[in-house]
Amino acid sequence: MKKSVQKNVKGKQVNLKVKPSVHDLSKTQQTKLTVGSMGLGLIIIQHGPYLQISHLITKGAAARDGTLQPGDVLISVGYANVLGYTLREFLKLLQHITIGTILQIKVYRDFIDIPQEWQEIYDLIPETKFPITRTTKKTEEAKDGSVTSSDDDEAFDTRLKYYKYPRSTGHYPVRRPMSISREWHGYKKKNHVMRVGKDINCDVMIHRDHKKEVRAPSPYWTMVKQDNEISSSSSASSTSDAFWLEDCTPVEKGSSEPVSRVG
């Protein structure tokens, strides 16, 4: 509590009690960052009505600058006041900013704490680790043959091996997590053979069109054909008689079998 002394019109002293501010928002930080290939190098979450920095990307612009820290609340980015912005509105703002642009960023320090659930999943965010490039089998064999294991290799963080992609999944860009849905439910082309015929066991069955009046083969023509196969000495008169009998065989409308009449 602070006391201030003021004089009234008659010259008497009056003691006024002044309460200090409950929220001290004067603790602000500001810096200038250059937009790079990884943006500003910040991982930002929506914490109530504020945009809060949860993590810094290793080797990003913010990590190299060293001014911003996890837990800072964004006040302004460039000329835009982002207090009350949602993550979607903030993303639209960053989409119009090109690489190489220098932005002045202003934040609140020690204003609100990072939610506990975001602090526990730090190791599950691949962007917090530095990019790991894939090495081919030939380069790995060359390293095994020429270079032996050293203390630096033993001090390497084993948790980073978790982010290496398996060989069977094909080529993926650096720093891009593998899509489980695309890997499990991807379209796989298979060859299928379909059988077409008049048999009922075929995949595609051909049916006869009964609407058309199709003339069945004449039994006389079959008889003459079999006689020709057995004996080659058939006369021309028997063949002509068979054709004459076939021509005289009419087809009744609406019936599938021919009726032979000789008149």
UniProtKB/Swiss-Prot annotation:
PROSITE patterns: PDZ. Residues 30-109 form the PDZ domain. Disulfide bonds: none annotated. This is PDZ domain-containing protein 9. The lineage of its organism: Eukaryota, Metazoa, Chordata, Craniata, Vertebrata. The gene is PDZD9.
